[in-house]
């Protein structure tokens, strides 16, 4: 759910959209930007007090990032998706944000499809009542994962679906030899999740 540093700007996802998201993901493992009451039907929630940006993310994720600072949240999602910890994700973003620099990592290297929602959204307030006014701009539901056909099929009646890319099917799940975290690679013999761990491991071997 969306939250900002200004309580008056809190905007929560409408129920009809949450049902679509649950259907696409076949259940939500994590809502990393959850409202205080944890209204989203997810297995795990990170509220403002938990600070989702300070936590590891995994499984199927629904992210409706804070309006005031979506870039850090999107980047955090991309990192954990490429590591293999996040298996599927849906991100709710204003259409105008899709071309921003902060969304480049998401749209160019991570997302596999998106749907331009056919109607403007009317969010809920902190009491979960309809705020009574439509958003001033259209929104998109951005999908990250291998089940693009499922996503596009289940959202086609709510807007215009767009396929971005198909992920390689020969991707293997591996564990980083240095940090122990899971990551995806084309070779099952891959040892490190990234250049940082590779460099640290090399320095460690030199010092021994």
Question: Predicted regions span which residues?
Answer:
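Class I S-adenosyl-L-methionine-dependent methyltransferase catalytic core
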Residues: 1-176, 207-208
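BZIP DNA-binding basic region
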Residues: 169-208
């Amino acid at each position: 759910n969306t939250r900002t540093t200004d309580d008056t700007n809190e905007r929560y996802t409408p129920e009809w959209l949450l049902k679509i998201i649950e259907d696409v993901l076949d259940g939500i493992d994590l809502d990393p930007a959850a409202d205080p009451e944890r209204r989203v039907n997810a297995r795990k929630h990170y509220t403002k007090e938990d600070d989702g940006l300070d936590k590891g993310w995994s499984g199927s994720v629904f992210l409706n990032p804070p309006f005031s600072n979506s870039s850090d949240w999107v980047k955090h999602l991309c990192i954990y998706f490429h590591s293999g910890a996040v298996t599927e994700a849906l991100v709710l973003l204003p259409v105008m944000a899709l071309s921003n620099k902060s969304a480049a990592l998401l749209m160019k290297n991570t997302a596999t499809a998106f749907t331009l929602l056919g109607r403007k959204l009317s969010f809920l307030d902190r009491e979960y009542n309809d705020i009574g006014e439509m958003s001033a701009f259209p929104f998109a539901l951005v999908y990250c994962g291998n089940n693009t056909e499922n996503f596009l099929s289940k959202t086609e009646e709510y807007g215009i679906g767009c396929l971005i890319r198909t992920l390689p099917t020969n991707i293997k799940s591996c564990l980083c030899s240095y940090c122990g975290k899971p990551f995806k690679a084309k070779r099952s013999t891959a040892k490190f999740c990234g250049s940082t761990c590779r460099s640290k491991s090399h320095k460690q071997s030199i010092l021994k």
